[in-house]
Amino acid sequence: MNLFQNAKFFTTVNHLKDLPDTPLEIAFVGRSNAGKSSAINTLTNHVRLAYVSKTPGRTQHINFFELQNGNFMVDLPGYGYAQVPEAVRAHWVNLLGDYLRHRKQLIGLVLIMDARHPLKELDIRMLDFFHTTGRPVHILLSKADKLSKNEQIKTLSQVKKLLKPYSDRQNISVQLFSSLKKQGIDEANRTVGSWFDAADAAASSPEEN
């Protein structure tokens, strides 16, 4: 079953006080222009569920989409885009950081990286920051179609090697993904679906004395 199929827009939020009361959430984040909106549209089989723009930094709020299992997917503002006023950028940073740090409903993070330029400084900082929450991270190496098959294999291997210190301390997984070629949809579904399954199992299990 495609977990993301038939996802529906729910609401958009610009302040933490306006966050909706939801069951469980998984969030999508990435550098501006890493292909986050295209990845969301591909996973949900929607043409324009998430706004795709040639202008980096277009996603400026926290957007909520309801999944068919009743839980939520959250599209967070992209990071690393400097061509906005300082006050706006500071607001994005605070909004993003406070949501990731304090949102109790959040069970995992999908981090989008351009397969041609993975693990940039801000991506590493995001991994370090999110590590403190103890929640899993799944990395989509987007735009994989821009690489040859050999380059894809080499890139995935290199990224896994570089992530080894992080995967030793927290649950981190990584895969290749292409919105253009519809590559990696099933793998992303399985990984994120397992997060919801684990959260449901933990919630239904009796507390130990």
From Swiss-Prot:
**SUPFAM superfamilies cross-referenced by the UniProt entry:** P-loop containing nucleoside triphosphate hydrolases (SSF52540)
Q: Cross-referenced Pfam families, in alphabetical order?
A: MMR_HSR1 (PF01926)
Record-linked InterPro entries: G_ENGB_dom (IPR030393), GTP-bd (IPR006073), GTP-bd_ribosome_bio_YsxC (IPR019987), P-loop_NTPase (IPR027417)
GO molecular function annotation? GTP binding; metal ion binding
Q: List the GO biological process terms.
A: division septum assembly
Required co-factor?
Mg(2+)
PROSITE patterns xrefs: G_ENGB
What this protein is reported to do is described as: Necessary for normal cell division and for the maintenance of normal septation.
PANTHER family associated with the record: ENGB-TYPE G DOMAIN-CONTAINING PROTEIN (PTHR11649:SF13), MSS1/TRME-RELATED GTP-BINDING PROTEIN (PTHR11649)
Protein name stated in the entry: Probable GTP-binding protein EngB
Quote the gene name from the UniProt entry.
Answer: engB
